[in-house]
Amino acid sequence: MQAFYADHFVLPLPEGHRFPMAKYKLLRDRVVREMTGVEMLQAPAASDGELALAHNPDYIAAITHGTLAASSQREIGFPWSLAMAERARRSVGATVAAARLALGLGSHGQEQRQGVAANMAGGTHHAYAHKGGGFCVFNDVAVAARLMQAEWTRLYRNTRPPLQVAIIDLDVHQGNGTASIFANDASVFTLSVHGARNFPFRKEASDLDVELPDGCQDAAYMEALEHALDELQRRFQPGLVLFLAGADPFEGDRLGRLKLTYDGLEARDRRVFDWAWQRRIPLAFCMAGGYGLNIDETVQVQLNTFRVAFEYWCKWAQMNIL
């Protein structure tokens, strides 16, 4: 299984900043140390043209050239720096590359579908077309969805229907930027399962929003997820799934307000991967949020996601051999 990383582009954050930047390197180290069969690849940087599939040119230029207003930097939560701009491009590029591998779209045409591939960061779902927010600069899943649709159309214009993409966002915070970008796009289905009383406090309308009460535990969460997947299946037929596997519904997360256990989050991940596998839908996933009081707990949740993902990548690999 291929996984794309960009943790070597470290943001120069002020002392005491609440974003746990170290989690990305910690996760990569544990995957390398504890798993075999995962190939680590450096994330490519998304180009201006790729970013423009989901973002306004003026906003892209402001991030690139450091002309972003101080108020906009505060809304994002990161001070501007060259490293911030580069890392944001790499985070998008990682999800694009993972989606391309999962779907089997190579730079020179069709390649064998991997079925499952990973971005070891990403899930920057609070970024709108014209602005960032909530530690999100560019919206990686929005760019990836649009770019995969464009590449699919170029390759299969006269032989297959257009590519439809389902974004399954299980970060504890609503994917407001993603919902806004695809508000009038029937070819992309946005599903968000999130805390009702959590950030963002002014939410957008996804194609399907599932709001959960504070303190929601494993059983209630899984019931809600099952209903959501049934509704997705009833309303939409995706050819690609982009999965935001947020670690922040975990009971030890300081920003999450839900009470899922390790077992509950592993069951959540398994249900999503299995849902896609049973329908033979390629899936690219990213890590999204995770703000554990103990950073090692966040990393453990994410490592468990990788272990489940690898099981389903193996199923795809076996099918490809046969």
Give, region by region, the residue ranges found by the protein language model.
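Hydrophobic residues in alpha-helical segments
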Residues: 31, 54, 63-64, 99-109
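Glycine-/proline-rich flexible loop or hinge segments
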Residues: 8-13, 45-49, 71-84
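N-terminal low-complexity, Ser/Thr- and acidic-residue-enriched intrinsically disordered segments
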Residues: 1-46
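A general "terminal functional-core" signal
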Residues: 70-322
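Short, flexible active-site-adjacent loop segments at beta-strand->alpha-helix junctions, enriched
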Residues: 7-9, 57, 123-124, 194
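Acidic carboxylate-rich catalytic motifs and surrounding loops in phosphoryl-/glycosyl-chemistry enzymes
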Residues: 38-48, 284-293
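Charged, often glycine-rich, active-site loop that binds/positions anionic groups
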Residues: 46-68
